[in-house]
């Protein structure tokens, strides 16, 4: 990896290609050169200078690759925080639904106890303490009328 440095805004501005584009183009027409010039390109070729230039170019390309990698990964890192917040929100909602389930479970236990008490009271051996069916039904309807809004609100919160 290359050295750590701040992310550039425009990667193309720092490349060697851009520097080459800034130089004015020169056109040479064959046959218009000086006759004294030797056209052998291998005569002026310095292999050490070429290798040093290629190392610099390779290092520059590695830096550009690192910058592109960082710029491509940056949105993913931002999305990780959103995913974490979303999962925390789901955990909080799940915790709330567990509380609602506990409340509904306690209501069901209360209804079961009420039913057992009514049945025990109904089967009482003492005929003077008997309750008529109309009184029991009226009491159950009143209880249902009181608990229906509470249960519908709990169900609404559970499904929310």
Swiss-Prot record:
It is a single-pass membrane protein. Keywords: Apoptosis, Membrane, Mitochondrion, Transmembrane, Transmembrane helix, Ubl conjugation. It is found in: Endomembrane system; Mitochondrion membrane. The chain crosses the membrane at residues 136-156. The record marks 153-154 as: Cleavage. Proteolytically cleaved by RHBDL4/RHBDD1. RHBDL4/RHBDD1-induced cleavage is a necessary step prior its degradation by the proteosome-dependent mechanism. Ubiquitinated by the ECS(ASB11) complex in response to endoplasmic reticulum stress, leading to substrate recognition by the segregase p97/VCP and degradation by the proteasome. Residues 137-158 are annotated as: Leucine-zipper. It comes from Homo sapiens (Human). Its main location: membrane. One of its GO terms (cellular component) is Bcl-2 family protein complex. Disulfide bonds: none annotated. This is Bcl-2-interacting killer.
